[in-house]
UniProtKB/Swiss-Prot annotation:
It is found in: Cell membrane. Pfam families: CDP-OH_P_transf. The lineage of its organism: Bacteria, Bacillati, Bacillota, Bacilli, Bacillales. Belongs to the CDP-alcohol phosphatidyltransferase class-I family. GO terms for biological process: phospholipid biosynthetic process. It catalyses: a CDP-1,2-diacyl-sn-glycerol + L-serine = a 1,2-diacyl-sn-glycero-3-phospho-L-serine + CMP + H(+). Its EC number is 2.7.8.8. Disulfide bonds: none annotated. It is a multi-pass membrane protein. This is CDP-diacylglycerol--serine O-phosphatidyltransferase. GO terms for cellular component: plasma membrane. The chain crosses the membrane at residues 4-24, 28-48, 77-97, 116-136, 140-160. It comes from Bacillus subtilis (strain 168). It comes from the Bacteria.
Length: 177
C-alpha cells in the first residue's frame, strides 16, 4: 500500500507529459484536460501518503518533479502555443521565465518551508491553473504580462494560504467547516 501515493504522483507526471505531447500536435483542449487531471491527482497524492502512513523524502521529490512538468512546463508551453508565439523574443522569454521560476519555487519549498502553515510564494499548481485560464484570453500582451506576474509571485516572499492542506485535513477528518 505504501506505493499508492507514488503511483498517484506518477499519474500527475504522466498527465504533464501528455499535456506537452498534446501541444506538440496543437491539441490545446486535450492539453488543458491533462493539466487539470494532473491537478486533481496532485491534490490526492499527499493525502494518500498521510492516510497510508507512507510520507517519504522520495515521495516529496517525485511530487516536485511531477509538479514542475504538469504546472511549470506544460502551462508555459500552452501559453506560448496559444498566443505568446506572436511575440517572437518576448514570448519565449516569458515562457522560459515562468518555468524557471516554477523550478526555483519548488526547490525553495523543498528546502525551506514544507512544514509552515502558509506558503511563501504562490504555489505552482495554483500558478499553473491561473496561467491555463489566462491563456484562453488569446491576448499575447495580457498573457505576457500575466506570465511575468505569475513568475514573480511564485518566487516572491508573499504569503499564500495553504488551501490544499486545510482541505485535505477536513476531507480526511470527514468534516467541512
Amino acid at each position: 500500500m505504501n506505493y499508492i501515493p507514488c503511483m498517484i504522483t506518477i499519474g500527475n507526471f504522466i498527465c504533464g507529459l501528455l499535456a506537452i505531447h498534446s501541444l506538440l500536435y496543437h491539441n490545446i483542449h486535450s492539453a488543458v484536460l491533462f493539466i487539470f487531471t494532473g491537478m486533481f491527482l496532485d491534490f490526492f497524492d499527499g493525502m494518500a501518503a498521510r492516510k497510508l502512513n507512507a510520507v517519504s523524502d522520495m515521495g516529496r521529490e517525485l511530487d516536485s518533479f511531477a509538479d514542475l512538468v504538469t504546472f511549470g512546463v506544460a502551462p508555459s508551453m500552452l501559453a506560448y502555443s496559444v498566443a505568446l508565439y506572436t511575440l517572437p523574443f518576448i514570448g519565449i522569454l516569458c515562457a522560459l521565465t515562468y518555468s524557471i521560476c516554477g523550478m526555483l519555487r519548488l526547490s525553495k519549498f523543498n528546502i525551506e518551508q514544507s512544514k509552515l502553515p502558509t506558503f511563501i510564494g504562490m504555489p505552482i499548481p495554483f500558478a499553473g491553473m491561473c496561467l491555463v485560464i489566462l491563456s484562453f484570453t488569446y491576448n499575447p500582451i495580457l498573457l505576457a504580462i500575466g506570465t511575468c506576474g505569475l513568475s514573480y509571485l511564485m518566487v516572491s516572499k508573499i504569503k499564500f494560504p495553504h488551501f490544499k492542506k486545510h482541505a485535505a485535513e477536513n476531507l480526511e477528518s470527514g468534516r467541512w467547516n
